[in-house]
């Protein structure tokens, strides 16, 4: 949908409903993890992709009605990739009236020099970007760094670590940076990628494709993403259930001795988390936990979001 096209009442209604859902998801994540506090200066990392555009739009929207005051500054890292449209983001951000900074660093040249042809560039590229963004956050006096990773990214990372790294480790909604100086937040942690895609299409954001890493075929992350997408089509509700599982961890029923003192279990020990179910069949719900049909979800949105229409 182009910005200059007149949209129908139904399209506007659907867009309003979608924006309210994303706004609710972001608001809940912010509240659950205390992502944003009074007086925060949030550095919004804007890549030019659908996720970061959506994050900026929803944070700007929340800024107008939030019970606390916080400011936003958008930051884009121009990595000097051939053909990168340097004018797109400045024009877009100036039109919005958003404070911004474009950081120019030739990380593209470094990656191409260091990584052999045909090898994945993501690891080195992300390390270089991270250091530059931390430095920029310090220069701008930012108290939080906001990244545009969503629920699907978090699940993909969980499976990547399980399949290839031998760890049950996802992507935290909030963390202290590895240099110990910055707090990183992921406001889209509860948002579905398909909602973000629909919103970005409807808003006609000026998307800038990543020619450095996002287009590389057969990446491990892409394989995982395709697997999860297939599961979502074949088994509705599975994605929601898996994400719910990440929020309901039972250490006593796993095998990590750092999380639970198995050696300390002796006769007379307190029963923990239901005790021994080894000889019983645990009751499994007929429907996936946390899932509901699209129609019911839309009806719930109407009840939850009885607010003034989002413009």
UniProtKB/Swiss-Prot annotation:
Family, as annotated: Belongs to the TtcA family.
Cofactor binding annotation: Binds 1 [4Fe-4S] cluster per subunit. The cluster is chelated by three Cys residues, the fourth Fe has a free coordination site that may bind a sulfur atom transferred from the persulfide of IscS.
Lineage, opening ranks: Bacteria, Pseudomonadati, Pseudomonadota, Gammaproteobacteria, Enterobacterales
Pathway: tRNA modification
SUPFAM superfamilies (alphabetical): Adenine nucleotide alpha hydrolases-like
Catalysed reaction, written as an equation: cytidine(32) in tRNA + S-sulfanyl-L-cysteinyl-[cysteine desulfurase] + AH2 + ATP = 2-thiocytidine(32) in tRNA + L-cysteinyl-[cysteine desulfurase] + A + AMP + diphosphate + H(+)
The protein, known as: tRNA-cytidine(32) 2-sulfurtransferase
Remarks, miscellaneous: The thiolation reaction likely consists of two steps: a first activation step by ATP to form an adenylated intermediate of the target base of tRNA, and a second nucleophilic substitution step of the sulfur (S) atom supplied by the hydrosulfide attached to the Fe-S cluster.
Nucleotide-binding keyword on record: yes
